[in-house]
Regions:
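A short, Trp-centered hydrophobic/proline-enriched beta-strand micro-motif
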Residues: 123-132
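Buried hydrophobic positions in well-ordered alpha/beta secondary-structure cores of metabolic enzymes
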Residues: 15, 26, 55, 62, ...
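Intrinsic disorder at enzyme termini
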Residues: 1-17, 148
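Hydrophobic, small-residue-rich alpha-helical packing segments that form membrane-like cores
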Residues: 136-140, 155
Length: 209
């Protein structure tokens, strides 16, 4: 097995160590899953917990919330290593660990971080980002029709999302919705939506190439 030498491109030994670990794990544990995932449209949810034990989840999450406290560059190397052996699971990893979890780390309040981040880091939660909608083109934010209306201390979301990576398996989604239509794409807020929230449902999986 020949593992790419990152130091050739100016990266340091810590980056190389992270890449090596993810590369070896993916080649041994994730590559054998590819055929079943592609042929049977099967998703190995249990492998998220296994990936957590290897330190592959919550890379950018501060240690106080259960993560590794590293930067997004380490996350990129881990994703690339996984993608070399199982590109489907790499896309899932990116949607959960970066688009959803890293977004929470950057923008959620402290209470929300303590509530959600540890479960992502231990592989109990799989995440997704709910942005794209039916009929949306390149202007996914400007054309967004999903709304969020405040009712007392809560917000009521109304709308549909489509082509959401991890959508059928996500435990928690970060959903974008318009809270101020007059501001167009500048009037969008992000909401944490759990799969068991009242009124939330997931449609059928879409066949893919």
């Amino acid at each position: 097995m020949t593992i790419p030498n990152l130091t050739t491109f100016g990266f340091d030994s810590e980056h190389q160590a992270a890449y090596d670990m993810a590369y070896r794990y993916a080649s041994e544990e994730l590559y054998p899953l590819c055929e079943k995932m592609d042929n049977d449209e099967w998703f190995p949810e249990e492998h998220y917990r296994a990936m957590s034990k290897e330190g592959l989840l919550g890379i950018t999450v501060p240690s106080e919330y259960g993560g590794s406290g590293l930067n997004v560059l380490f996350q990129c190397f881990v994703c690339e290593a996984i993608s070399y052996w199982n590109h489907t699971l790499a896309a899932s990893f990116l949607a959960s660990d970066n688009l959803c979890l890293d977004n929470l780390v950057r923008n959620a309040n402290d209470l929300q971080k303590h509530q959600y981040c540890p479960k992502f880091c231990e592989g109990t939660y799989i995440g997704a980002l709910g942005m794209t909608e039916p009929g949306a083109g390149s202007d996914a934010l400007g054309s967004m029709a999903t709304t969020a209306a405040q009712k007392g201390d809560e917000y009521i979301l109304n709308g549909r999302k489509l082509f959401i990576t991890n959508g059928p398996v996500a435990d928690v989604l970060l959903v974008y919705a318009k809270t101020d239509k007059e501001k167009n794409k500048h009037g969008i807020s992000a909401f944490i939506v759990e799969k068991n929230f009242e009124g939330f449902s997931v449609a059928q999986k879409l066949d893919k190439m």
